Curated annotation (Swiss-Prot):
Residues involved in Mg(2+) 1 binding: 436, 509
GO BP: DNA topological change; DNA-templated DNA replication
Cofactor annotation comment: Binds two Mg(2+) per subunit. The magnesium ions form salt bridges with both the protein and the DNA. Can also accept other divalent metal cations, such as Mn(2+) or Ca(2+).
Protein name: DNA gyrase subunit B
Family note: Belongs to the type II topoisomerase GyrB family.
A single GO molecular function term of this UniProt record: ATP binding
Organism, scientific name: Myxococcus xanthus
Extra facts: Few gyrases are as efficient as E.coli at forming negative supercoils. Not all organisms have 2 type II topoisomerases; in organisms with a single type II topoisomerase this enzyme also has to decatenate newly replicated chromosomes.
Record region (Disordered): 1-21
Domain Toprim: 430-545
Subcellular location: Cytoplasm
Membrane-traversing stretches: none
Subunit note: Heterotetramer, composed of two GyrA and two GyrB chains. In the heterotetramer, GyrA contains the active site tyrosine that forms a transient covalent intermediate with DNA, while GyrB binds cofactors and catalyzes ATP hydrolysis.
Entries under HAMAP family matching the protein: GyrB
Amino acid sequence: MEKTPATGSAVAPPPVEYGTDSITKLEGREAVRKRPGMYIGDTMAYGLHKLVYEVVDNAVDESLAGHCTDIEVVIHVDGSLSVQDNGRGIPVGPHPKFPGKDTLEVVLTELHAGSKFGNGAYKVSGGLHGVGVTCVNFLSEWFKVRVHRNGIVYEQAYAQGVPDTPPREVGTTDKRGTHIAFKPDATVMELVEFNFETLSQRLRELAFLNAGLHIVVRDERTNKEHDFKFDGGISSFVEYLNKSKQTLHDKPISFSTEREGVMLDIAMQWNDGYDERIYTFANNINTHEGGSHLSGFKAALTRTLNSYAEKGSLWKDLKETPTGEDAREGLSAVISVKLTNPQFEGQTKTKLGNSEVKGLVEQMVNDQLGSFLEETPMVAKKVVAKIGDACRARLAARKARETVRRKGVLDGGGLPGKLADCQIRDPNESELYIVEGDSAGGSAKQGRDRRNQAILPLRGKILNVEKLLREMLTSAEIVTLITALGNGIGAEDYDPEKARYHRIFLMTDADVDGSHIRTLLLTSSSGRCRSSCRRAISTSRSRRSYKVTRNKKDQYVKDEHALNEYLLKIASEHARVLTPGGELGGAELKALLEKVITYEERLEKQAKRRDARVVDALVQGARLSAETLTGRGCPGGGGEGRLMTPSSAACRTCWAACATSWCRTPSTTPRSWCSTPTRMEPCGRRCSTTPSCRRRSTWSCRLCAEHLRGAGQGAVQGPRGRGEITVFSVQEVLAAVRKDAQRGLGLQRYKGLGEMNPEQLWDTTMNPATRTLLQVRVEDAVESDEIFSLLMGEAVEPRREFIERNALDVQNLDI
């Protein structure tokens, strides 16, 4: 800002006129593209996948109306996505209230246009606001719709919400339904890459909620596919939630009923765990924050169970009546309501607001659950006994907390002796580092920023709370952690407003023990200690493992991949690849080497299931057959049976050891390489009919066509006249420049935190300007809970099956 010579004060900005012409109104497409967050929540992962859900919800509404049985969702390789259903199809034809506009175009370009506002076409629906598919159109780079209706196929395309042409007939059909394909607009959306697992989680929910609805989701980028169809409906959902648990009764308690226009479906089952997992839905929309239907269920559940137990004098030995938390301990339940006019709190529909629903749900649960308990006394007594045990455990835990509190450990007045607190008291600015080991904790205390960084060293492996929850408060390390966080634990003591730190960092060694400790800490934060960490941003520290010294200057890199990137940067700055066809260096050489590294990484993944040398030969275009694989067509003359690649000698050695069945069906138009001492050019298009081989061949062809011409036989020349190295393949180029880049470098690897002094810990791990963080987020609570129960729980057999099933996919194996 300029300052006047006389006073040194800032020059005032020019006045801004604020009059009637300052008031503007955004409408339709312009409003959505200008403020997308108002319609889809945000422009990151949530909003991106919200676009898909809006389209899918329309297909599900067709299913609710009884007109759709199949939905297919496909993520395409170009980043687009398509949704196909076999419903009635969007109506096509002139619209009576929009002269000159087709009904299909009205649906896709007019906000709040649809057939879900009356009680005609749809009795219930989730897409009440009428902006869903229109927003998808407006926020897409391109959008295409194909409608099969009344024996005719109609198509229309859009670019950023603007129609290219009116809907047109393109053929006849005996099918029906709507096919929508779109590609998110990167100029509006910050994230445009769809996550297969995120979509699968939501589509699985929809298949559970709509018994018999068949949903397929496929990812063409990775060839992953999930096929969902559950005839058991939400009962199957509850069984899925409890599949890694020991259940209290064999089958879920389920019932469906309706009262005053509200349809209620409930399924629930208790297990021997301690956490409640209740998922609520309104018109198939996942109401993450609950609402009136959840409130009604909780009230009715507690009242009905207490009434049944008191009537039979089943809790006469208890010192106090069990609470709602006791009744829901170990409960997995799914609550689904369907109503004509749902009222959601906000466009994102995360909480149901219909006040009348609470009373109706409460009445229906009272009646249905009460009847079930009377009719099945064996199950009822097991449930009541479980609740009684939960009440006794809660009272015992309260007594233990009070005992510990009297000793000054859990109360707010005394902090753990190990904790080196920070000076700031604002939780939003405070950071807590949970450090493995007292030695590393001491160095971290010396190297930290005392203003806002607190250090809590923990010794050894903490308790696995997934297995030993009852003993949790007897563990000194767990009590220390709870006390340091400050927001308590359990329904009675938990208060999120008392959290002392809103950012938590886990710092462990880069070895198997450190990984184990980090897993135990994450288990505690995901299980019963979840409430203590709910307000915190749980962050796992990715510590930098290498120190590179070059020209007397130190630089830290976090892992081997980053180290290779660093070496590649150095190599491309100085090294040159000399060929008769020209010289490669700088950015061009770096681009080539990055492609080769990617190729080698993909080849390494293939090695887990097949011989990587054969894969490499196939990808490079070798014409392999049963004869060549067994060695009968091996070396010698120029027969077609031999590998025609510069690296054929290395590949030949593996032929005899490879199973001929790996490439059972050789292509009739095999790909081969015509090689000369200086040039390689592809002379075919296909390599093998094996799908994985075709995918890799496509990539390899692109690599060779763009970068490998002229990079066959040649020489790698190092800087400052270090000499030349003759090479015969791009892999040899990569090895040569890597070796040259490492000359004169000092390389030190840090495996343990204790190996670093305070200054190094600050530079690599704690300095906000240079540290690298890995944030831990729970995007799929169901899958998260299942994996923790499976891998950290008491049941051994499911864990062994999981390990055997995924053994070949392991990435970090410590032997």
